[in-house]
């Protein structure tokens, strides 16, 4: 499971001209799911994201977490995070999980964030979405559950 995390001042996702999810300060999380992912991967990423210390404290140091600042997450499913661009000019998406496997894990990830006290807004799984945000920093991180310690 792969997450691209962008610290945002505000963000929203629109489907068919209608806003379906919006947050003020927090993270936009683009989440990609692969075939081997499980609910353990979802829980690992949720725990990591809820506690990442990338918000500034009173001294201007990145020392506060999403929970510390009362931030929210705008969670957007993104199968293209598993695009393989090594060969040719068209990405290969064979590593991305099919919807019947990915949707329950996407929902488990969002539920795991909520269980940790994070307010979560979402896009629409599988839909064409317009995502807009005001980057804060910018701060952008990539976390892959396959790279967690003890998993090498």
From Swiss-Prot:
It is an enzyme of class 3 (hydrolase). A motif (Gly-cisPro motif, important for rejection of L-amino acids) lies at residues 137-138. Homodimer. CDD domains: Dtyr_deacylase. Its EC number is 3.1.1.96. An aminoacyl-tRNA editing enzyme that deacylates mischarged D-aminoacyl-tRNAs. Also deacylates mischarged glycyl-tRNA(Ala), protecting cells against glycine mischarging by AlaRS. Acts via tRNA-based rather than protein-based catalysis; rejects L-amino acids rather than detecting D-amino acids in the active site. By recycling D-aminoacyl-tRNA to D-amino acids and free tRNA molecules, this enzyme counteracts the toxicity associated with the formation of D-aminoacyl-tRNA entities in vivo and helps enforce protein L-homochirality. Keywords: Cytoplasm, Hydrolase, RNA-binding, tRNA-binding. It catalyses: glycyl-tRNA(Ala) + H2O = tRNA(Ala) + glycine + H(+); a D-aminoacyl-tRNA + H2O = a tRNA + a D-alpha-amino acid + H(+). Gene3D superfamilies: D-tyrosyl-tRNA(Tyr) deacylase. Belongs to the DTD family. NCBIfam families: D-aminoacyl-tRNA deacylase (TIGR00256). A Gly-cisPro motif from one monomer fits into the active site of the other monomer to allow specific chiral rejection of L-amino acids. It comes from Geobacillus kaustophilus (strain HTA426). GO terms for molecular function: D-tyrosyl-tRNA(Tyr) deacylase activity; Gly-tRNA(Ala) deacylase activity; Ser(Gly)-tRNA(Ala) hydrolase activity; tRNA binding. The lineage of its organism: Bacteria, Bacillati, Bacillota, Bacilli, Bacillales. This is D-aminoacyl-tRNA deacylase. GO terms for biological process: D-amino acid catabolic process. Its main location: cytoplasm. It is found in: Cytoplasm.
